[in-house]
């Protein structure tokens, strides 16, 4: 969805090559002209009216807004208390200045319309009232205090196939009621489900209908929306219907059982190609421990042929869900829980920043790491391979699964020679040991912020990564898109610190990302052989 206003300069016509000292147009800072440049003929800007029939105009006449509960791309969710009854709710305040396009505005209108249209359901959050003032649209909703789906799974020490079956059954019941009432959700993902309260028996509730649409039987859609890892192949092909919700639920089920998405890559084009190919991998841990019934259901939910894909009712009728209470109750292992907690793949900016921090480590900080490297380097070559890394980490008390070890190796192996040299190992150690204190991070940020204005801008990022292997415009754009959470087209120190401390998490993917980038990527894929569907290792 929408981006921030203003541009950062422009390129001369027919000159597409970035040059030193010359600003390239900032593709992440776009002026859509909805908030200025228009008017009533007298120089006064037109007022933006979003809702057709809000409950009222002044939310504070009835409610007291309290602490912040969450923050998204378009606004903030607050704790909200009814002044008369003291009942508590959640208030989702959507800032009008963030609604940059007609599509953004229509999404908000439709979200309200759909939530009003949906029947009361124990697993769908209830919309109580709506307000609209000059600055924001306020949606007063049922309060869900139990936290996110994945967070609760991680908090439990014991995670099983039976628990995954119970969650999947709930999600599919939500999909079923949506489809029964002519609503296609289009953005099913774990973050859009919250537990109603903190009790163990709390209901799981769908909370976000911002990308949902009404549909009629047989109606086809072509707009690319959703979150990249959960998109069905037919969305990328621009010809889809409600079957996309079954696919997204299948992706969630896959993640619930193994901790990572089935279709993953480091760039958005790679993600799109993986989705189109639809190759499932049931060989790595913990899949050998997962029942055949569960794997059979995943195959049928993630069938690339939408005509063969199961309906919501057929999923609920599948033996694995029919017998959810008797599904295996054996722990799927700490690996899955750890992956759900954070599946981190470092982007090139983070890799470079880790090397800068490594270069600034004191002798005392670095010496212990170097000693560890020398112990691992049994062949005395000055570099270690993945086997030496595994043995060395085991000696140091780190038992890392083979798949995650390969991810770590790939992240650290900057020159792609299949080995880690001492400097690469130090950078990885900084990441593993969370050694990036404030002083280290400030030095690393200053390395990129060449003009000392407090931001890493596109040109500075491009220049800093110019000597990195595989750094294309697409990679630079993807870094900005991932790290620049306020969408002003540059990376602040706070955004940089967040990236360094949490990594690039596949769970966080904005609507902006999918709408603007996947539109062009789908066109590109339509023109090459990427649309051919291959077999899988199921």
Swiss-Prot record:
Binding annotation for Ca(2+) 4 = 484, 486, 488, 490, 495
Q: Which residues bind Ca(2+) 1?
A: 377, 379, 383, 388
Give me the reactions it catalyses: L-seryl-[protein] + ATP = O-phospho-L-seryl-[protein] + ADP + H(+); L-threonyl-[protein] + ATP = O-phospho-L-threonyl-[protein] + ADP + H(+)
Q: Where is the Protein kinase domain?
A: 63-321
Q: How is its activity regulated?
A: Activated by calcium. Autophosphorylation may play an important role in the regulation of the kinase activity.
List residues binding Ca(2+) 3.
449, 451, 453, 455, 460
Q: What is its main location?
A: nucleus
Q: What is one process in the GO biological process aspect for this record? A: abscisic acid-activated signaling pathway
Function, as annotated, reads: May play a role in signal transduction pathways that involve calcium as a second messenger. Involved in maintaining Ca2+ homeostasis in pollen tube tips by regulating CNGC18. Functions as regulator of the calcium-mediated abscisic acid (ABA) signaling pathway. Phosphorylates ABA-responsive transcription factor ABF4 in vitro.
Name it: Calcium-dependent protein kinase 32
Origin species, per record, is Arabidopsis thaliana
